[in-house]
Amino acid sequence: FDPGLINEAIATAPSEFTLHARNPQHSVTMNGDNIVFNMMASAPNCSDTDRGRRAGNQEDYRNFLRLAQMHNILHVTGGYPVEPVDIHPSVRHLDCIQDYITLTDKAYCIYALGEDRVSDAIEMTRIAHGLTRDPMRDQACMFSIINTNSPLQLDIPMTQGLMALAEMGQLVVITPFTLAGAMAPVTRAGAITLQNAEALAGVALSQMVRPGAPVMYGGFTSNVD
């Protein structure tokens, strides 16, 4: 991208916005002074003292959501706390979002794995919030982590998801998947430079789709050791 194009696009990104929960008491304001905690996401396994380590499943997924709802230190639920691999991937997002809606009243994270799944998530969330499509464009109710396919690439499903969410005014967190020594330079400076370039490209794309759409700069840079 041309530097001038990037600067012009990111200038429309909002410095503050609200992520709306179905329970207004759990809505959170995103800005430079607020810290928002959520669960980790996408663990393949879980464990406890009774049954030990096991593959992710819907029962445990639901129990983690109940914990997220109960704990006041978690402001939003985040993504799938454990991946429910007992649900077929083609319909997993439908079951997981239904569980979000029925077991929590906090904002949640959906997975931007293509336009169709994002459209399902938008429609289910819209209904749960009692909104029509136009008001929803001005009320961020969910978010998604958009990982780049480093180096310097956004794959098609993530790009489709990013654009669909931005068009509907829903929050996207652009998070480059940069591992130093693998898909990023091995030096700290090089890896962070790549992260910044990829993140700014994603932020700019969201604003090209809909100026003023809520967007955040995420970072994942680590190493392969």
Predicted regions and their residues:
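Helix-rich catalytic cores of soluble enzyme domains
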Residues: 49-225
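Glycine-rich, N-terminal phosphate-binding loop and its surrounding beta-alpha-beta segment
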Residues: 1-47
